[in-house]
Amino acid sequence: MRGTSIREGAPKTLLARALYDNHADCSDELAFSRGDILTIVEQNVPESEGWWRCLLHGRQGLAPANRLQVLRETPADRPCPLLPRGPDTDLTSSGAPYQVQDLISPPPQGPVYEPMRSWVEGPSPATAQVYELPESPSSARIICEKTLSFPKQALSVLPRPTRASLPTLPSQVYDVPVQRQGFSTLERLEKQQFYDIPTSSQKALLHSSTSQGRDVTLAPTMAFRQGGGYNPLSSPQKSERIHDTPVLLEKADVRNVSMTSFTKDSGSRAIPGSSAVHTGAVALSPQLGNTVQRKNSLPEEPTYAFPTSRDPLPSDAGGSYKVPSRFLIPRVEQQNTMPNIYDTPKAMQGVSHNAPKAMQGVSLAGKELERGREAPENSPWISGQTSFLSPDSDRLSVASSDSRASVVSSCSSISMDSSSGSSSEDSVKELWMDVDFAKETAVSLQHKVASSAAGLLLFVSRTWRFKDSLETNIHRIRRAADHVEESVREFLDFAQGVGGTACNLTDSYLQARIRDQLQTISSSYQTLLDAKGSLDRCNWSLEVLVTDKVQNSLDDLERFVATARIVPEDVKRFTSIVIANGKLLFKQNCEKGEMDLKCERCIRPPQRETESYQESSPFDRQPTTEHSFELARKNRVNVCWQQSPNLQEKGKPTMEGKSNRNPDFHGMSPPPLTSPSPSGQNTERKIHLSKHSRLYFGALFKAISVFASSLSNGQPPEVFITQSKLVITVGQKLVDTLCSETQEKDERNEILCGSSHLCGLLKDLALATKSAVIQYPSPSALSLLQSEVERLEHHSRKFRDTLE
């Protein structure tokens, strides 16, 4: 709309559209935004070439001409009405009346402007050639700016869609075509038929009257909001004039339709107004023909009502209930030709149905849920149900479907988390053995890995891949590779058990070391498995393995040999970690062994009864594995009892008191302990110490005495740090000498037990020395260091007396 002059002969006002935003740099410049319509007041501004004087929203100023586009007037332009009229006044003109052009279809040929409101609006009487103006609150005002000479703005009032009245001129209005459902009978309706849309109160009366007396076919009606928008008619190029159903209103209000007529009369079928491809779903009954004839003959308005988005169909007695995969989309079930599709409410979720196929492959949790709900599958309460959905239950089913989808996803995630958690728990193994047995196991498995790798490397030479050499040794190489794989697997199982035991430690540094070394061994074992698997698949074929020249890249056999060459070093490093930290790793095992032994002592029968039971027992001969496991448990108990002699001393007076109170026990010797005390062992047999061991014991005692004297004399940290290092070094040499010289198993267990305790005291001494140096001259730190020195000296002398 352009702001032109309203008087004939007046100069035309030029309008321009802003192409870009403009910000005023001075007071004379006019600021505007892109898309604004400016009124050009003067194009030739003196001393301002390229600038126009323009007007925008009552503000006048200079605007750059290169940012404006002049709007040219076209012949189709018409002047705006001068003054707004009231709703009751008529506007007469000698010429043709003002008409609103329709974008979809040409305007009607009649002399009167007939606007379409909502669906159809009746025209004004033919004799009164007036332009109907609605009330000002519901009108849309379009304001056109005028020049400064016309300060008042002209208002053009356009009508908004209002509720239509009954038509009086059928030949001069749009006719609304009947919605096509594929029935030939509906095509015989009158071409010019008008539909009135009743209000919500009228609709309630219509539904009640329909359900009580009349046999009227239900056709779609919808509760439109007053003042709501509408979709235009379908394009006139279509061969069949089918009125398009408003999409937004259909989705919003389709659930508000009453279901009274559906539940009362099951004999009459509703014409589904929302689906145009409902093939074969509803047959044309005789009632429909009568109803259509009644529509054409009766002067009454035809009544139409929408069915709900889900047609309630009677369920079979043995029909299976399936949850549709796309139940959230409105009217999906009407487009589906399969019967018996029901949504499952939330409350029935605990009862089993035939689960949909899309749900069966979601996750393992879905299968577990299915198996858990198989018992009440054929419940008569479900199979005998005949449901008629109400709008409330329909909305509830949609809400329950959302919650059901979220519940299924959460159940699957929970079950996957629990399964992964259980698998991780199963993978973590802990070794319940004493320190000595763990060290022996680690050393023996390490020797096995080293010997098997050495046996394989015996065949590796400069010419071992030649045909003659490989043909001779191929079977031996294969057996050696099997031994390497088996030995590494056994050590890896033991290492994983140590890693599980290390999870109970508080030393994060030790846990990280064990975890990293275990990961290295696991990677090497996986490489061995992959290479050996490839060799087994080719059956160790000579044609594949024989080569007479140097290879640039490693094949499977070379990769296996290279990995077997480095595995013993990784295994040795892990074994050293276990030996050095065995007391920390398996300390809790000894404590549990002490508690188990304490319980055994309380309930152990006399020795004679035990011997007689063993003689009469038919299970005297046990497998070798059970015997070895029992022997390992006894060794653990022995070591733990040696480490806790005070537990023995506490148990002796208890047994003596019981024997004194009960005279029947006087003729019976008390049950012997599992192992005698170290002093008792010394009376029977002494361990012969070598010359080197004796020298190291003497050096240790001397270093400890010098260290203690320096502490008592108040020497500076530079002095007692050196003496502390000397004590620790001599102690480590002593432990290494004792462990290497002792070969017998019983003596070795005893020496390893005392040596591990000695190593622990040496570690405590190192920590106390570090603390004393940092806090020097703190008396508390020095006193703690002196107490550690005294403990070390006491245990060393006791250990020496125990051995010899």
Curated annotation (Swiss-Prot):
Main location: cytoplasm
Entry GO terms, CC: cytoplasm; cytoskeleton; focal adhesion
Bias (Basic and acidic residues): 649-664
Recorded name of the encoding gene: Cass4
Localization: Cytoplasm, Cytoskeleton; Cell junction, Focal adhesion
Domain called SH3: residue spans: 11-73
Domain of life: Eukaryota
Record carries keyword Phosphoprotein: yes
Compositionally biased region (Polar residues): 380-390
Transmembrane segments: none
Region of interest called Disordered, as start-end residue ranges on this chain: 369-395, 607-628, 642-686
Signal peptide: none
Family to which the UniProt record says this protein belongs: Belongs to the CAS family.
Protein name in the entry: Cas scaffolding protein family member 4
Modification after translation: Phosphorylated on tyrosines by SRC.
Role according to the record: Docking protein that plays a role in tyrosine kinase-based signaling related to cell adhesion and cell spreading. Regulates PTK2/FAK1 activity, focal adhesion integrity, and cell spreading.
GO biological process, one term: positive regulation of protein tyrosine kinase activity
UniProt keyword list: Cell adhesion, Cell junction, Cytoplasm, Cytoskeleton, Phosphoprotein, SH3 domain
Taxon lineage: Eukaryota, Metazoa, Chordata, Craniata, Vertebrata
Species of origin: Mus musculus (Mouse)
One GO molecular-function entry: protein tyrosine kinase binding
